[in-house]
Amino acid sequence: ILFTGGDPLFMKTKILEGYIDAILQADLPNLRTIRIGSKSLSYWPYRFLTDNDADALLALFEKIVSNGIHLAIMAHFNHPRELSTTAVELAISRIRQTGAQIRTQSPVLNHINNDPDLWATMWQRQVEMGIIPYYMFVARNTGAQHYFSIPLEEAWRIFRKAYQQVSGLARTVRGPVMSCDPGKVQVLGVSDIMNEKVYVLRALQHRNPKHVMKPFYAQYDPHAIWYNQLKPAFGKEKFFFE
């Protein structure tokens, strides 16, 4: 189960607890994990420190874990500066003490973090703080995409150069990834195959599990910033899963 939004941790704890309790009381046999996606650690770590219901929120996390369910906090950090305050260090420590695991994700954003050195620093710092680098996303095709997006090839090069700088403990991260119609599509690189320059892609998640982790190819387009701008390579009319 995934709680996302918006930001579900905008909710008061008693409201969130109502949803959680209903899930726990249902005693679902196939429920093993609850994920909560939130940027609160970066913009308001006091949600876990001094807010009126901060202790109640942490107690709720403990309750989830004590029921034998893995609780994953999917924390959004866009820049290493967001990891530099004492408040965020304390908040991360308090969350981890509940038994919850923190995993991190962020889009690569033009004007903000389109620099491999920033990503390497951020991932390494996250490991030092006991949290797990998880995803580098491509900026979604919504909102101010024209301002924040970068070409897919540039996103891949940023990911690759950052990945080369970190140890294996930080190489849990995957990217650059687009959350698009087929599922989660990762850009593995740019290559020349049969005299054609192509993007090499794969689906980390797909509506049809049979297609997960199977490579596929798109025509190289130096200006493409999203999946819907890609066309099948090698003269094919559609991708193999369409």
Question: Where do the language-model regions lie?
Answer:
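Active-site groove signature of glycoside hydrolases
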Residues: 2-7
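Auxiliary Fe-S-binding modules of radical SAM enzymes
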Residues: 120-242
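Conserved AdoMet/S-adenosylmethionine-binding subsite of the radical SAM
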Residues: 9-154, 158-166
